[in-house]
């Protein structure tokens, strides 16, 4: 399969997150030992985007993983402080520029923490990289990421 690598399961966010996490556990697509992490942190949306959408899909996934694993979920440790344009049509360099200074981590909450960062999709890794850098800058000891899907290769559609 080329393009997006997924778990081959349709995701209808609010209604199916619990089922998806149970399915991941059943399929052994799961981190068996979450005890190496102190907190689960979802990639944040800007408050305006969250109001517009009505939910943060990464937060819903993180909350369900926390519920199933008994781990602490800390959605307030990382905030999106700058509204950014959508990333969907941007390449790696443009995504990186688009996300400069977009995130702030709470240094008191992050200090000394080993963090599992959760997102729904990883395309170029720019969002996860900026979040990781900000959490480490704020004093986190380590940051690892868990995503449900990633784009293996981004193909350009159209000519030019």
List the model feature ranges, each with a label.
Residues 8-117, 124-160:
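Conserved PRPP/pyrophosphate-binding segment of the phosphoribosyltransferase/PRPP-pathway fold
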Residues 1-9:
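Short, small-residue-biased leader/transition segments that mark boundaries at the very start
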């Amino acid at each position: 399969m080329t393009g997006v690598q997924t778990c081959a399961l349709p995701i209808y966010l609010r209604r199916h997150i619990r089922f998806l996490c149970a399915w991941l556990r059943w399929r052994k697509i799961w981190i068996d030992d979450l005890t190496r992490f102190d907190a689960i942190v979802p990639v944040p949306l800007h408050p305006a985007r969250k109001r517009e959408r009505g939910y943060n899909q990464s937060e819903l996934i993180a909350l369900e993983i926390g519920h199933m694993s008994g781990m602490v979920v800390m959605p307030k440790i990382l905030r999106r402080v700058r509204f950014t344009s959508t990333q969907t049509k941007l390449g790696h360099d443009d995504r990186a520029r688009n996300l400069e200074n977009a995130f702030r981590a709470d240094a008191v909450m992050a200090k000394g923490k080993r963090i599992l960062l959760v997102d729904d999709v990883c395309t170029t890794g720019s969002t996860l990289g900026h979040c990781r850098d900000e959490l480490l800058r704020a004093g986190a000891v380590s940051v690892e990421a868990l995503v449900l899907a990633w784009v293996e290769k981004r193909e350009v559609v159209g000519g030019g």
